[in-house]
Each structure stands twice: as C-alpha cells, then as structure tokens.
Amino acid sequence: MDTKPVFHGSDIEKICSYYNLKKENIVKFGANVNPLGLSPKAGRAIAEHVDILSSYPDREYTSLRNTISSYCNIPADFILPGNGSSELISLLIQERAPKHTLILGPTYSEYSRELSFSGSTQEYYHLQESNDFEPDIPDLCRKLEQGYDFLILCNPNNPTSSAITQEELRRLIGFCAEKNIFVMIDETYVEFAPDINAITAVPLTREFTNLMVLRGVSKFFAAPGMRLGYGITGNMDFLAKMREKQTPWSLNSLGAFAGEIMLQDEDYIKETRNLILSERDRMIRE
C-alpha cells in the first residue's frame, strides 16, 4: 500500500518537489517561528562580526553560559549549550540509557525518534481533549508506577498549547525522584507563555537532580538555522557525563556570539511577547 511521506515544517524543498509547488507560494505554519523574524540587533551584530568564524569557539562557552545564567537566573555551572535541542535530547537519552519511557502526547516526534535508537520501550500518556489536554497529575503518577524510569514532557506542549504549573511540576518531579525516574522537560515554547514564571521548571533544577530542562532560540527568537540550544540541570555528575560525550565545538562561533546578543535584546523580547499575547487575545475574540 502506498503511503504519503511525512514532512517536517522545515522540509520546504522536499515539499515543493513532491507537490510541484513554488517556494514563494507556501505559507508556513509547521515551524511555529516568531513572525517578527530574527532580532534586528542580532542580525546587525552577526554581519559586523562574521569574521569570528575564522576562530574556534571557546570549548566551554563561558561567556554564553554566563549570559544564559543571567537570562534564566540559574548558575552557569548548571548549563550545557549544544547544537540545538536535538543534540541535547540525543545526548541526554544516550547518557541516561532509559529502559522504559513515558511521553506526554501528542507532542514533538523527535523524542520518539531518538528513543528508537536507544533500545528503550516507549509509551504515550495521551492528553485528552475532553480535559482541554491538561494532564491529570495524580493519574499520571499512577501510570508512572508501572515500571517507567524516564519521563518526557514538553511544557507548554506542542501542539496542544497546554501547560503544567510549576507547583504541579514540583509535585510530579518529587514523585519521580522517589521512584528513580528521570524527567526531561522541553521548554522550547515557554517564552510564548503569558506567565513564564508560573510554568517554568528551571528553578526546580536547584531542588531536584532527576531533572533536565531544555530550551533554545529556534522558535521565540526565530533562529532555527542557528542551531543553538541549552540544557539546564543541577545534577553536576550527569551534566559532566553528557559533556564528555558531546562533540567538541558542536556550537559554532557565530551561533554562540549571536545567542548572547539575542538573549540580552530586551526590546525584541518585549515586542515579541506583546505581539503574541495581543494576537492570541484577538484570535480568541474573533
């Protein structure tokens, strides 16, 4: 039986070829990227400093980690920059080597893809439309008692937009800590949330060693081609082991430099949040 191919939102060339379309006639909704585009300040800085590509980046990414530290209000030692969140997902799964994984879904397919290389079983905890795709935390905990050692969730979740509050996350991660379950939380979309502090798990990395939070610049900062992601965990031993497995200089010099500019561009951050939140309200009204 013939099956249609499945495309990622970035596979524009493949889509054009398969459907015989022109690139300029495609309106992209699959990548969820900030409609404002790249920060003008970052764009100018990249153009003015492109010569840094002639030098290797700092292997420790010290300046970038310090910038992320200020941006997230977390110690720089907790931070591991990488070649997009995809590299960090892969490194985390390789190092953790889970046997039985539970994923909150529907969600981003890359988690499942990386797990398929690890030998871990994987099962979805399906969020229900009847409950506005909000997870039932007590029920989720009961499910986790069935032999799982790894939990993956995206918060806010893509594509449902549902979010788990920080207090609910604290209870969930605490339960997982008692059961020796490691938790990976993908916060790729957290900057789009109305109240970031109400749902981010980053502060919880100070409390729990069975937690890693992933973020990046692909969506909110409209820079998916930069391939800059970062992981945050208070588990220093685990972080060191991930770093040992990471390819040296996996993030290029220009990406590391531009990441610092973007994360410090408060005007762009404010403009983006104002646009997204006001447009969200307008869409709901209309």
Give, region by region, the residue ranges found by the protein language model.
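N-terminal "arm"/small-domain region of PLP-dependent enzymes with the aminotransferase-like
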Residues: 1-55
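Short loop-beta-helix segment that forms the pyridoxal 5′-phosphate
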Residues: 57, 69-91
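Glycine/small-residue-rich loop that forms an oxyanion/phosphate-binding "nest" at active or ligand-binding sites
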Residues: 84-98, 185-189, 193-194, 204
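PLP-dependent aminotransferase-like
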Residues: 95-153
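Helix C-cap/helix->beta junction micro-motif
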Residues: 118, 178-179, 208
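Active-site phosphate-binding strand-loop segment of PLP-dependent enzymes
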Residues: 131-193
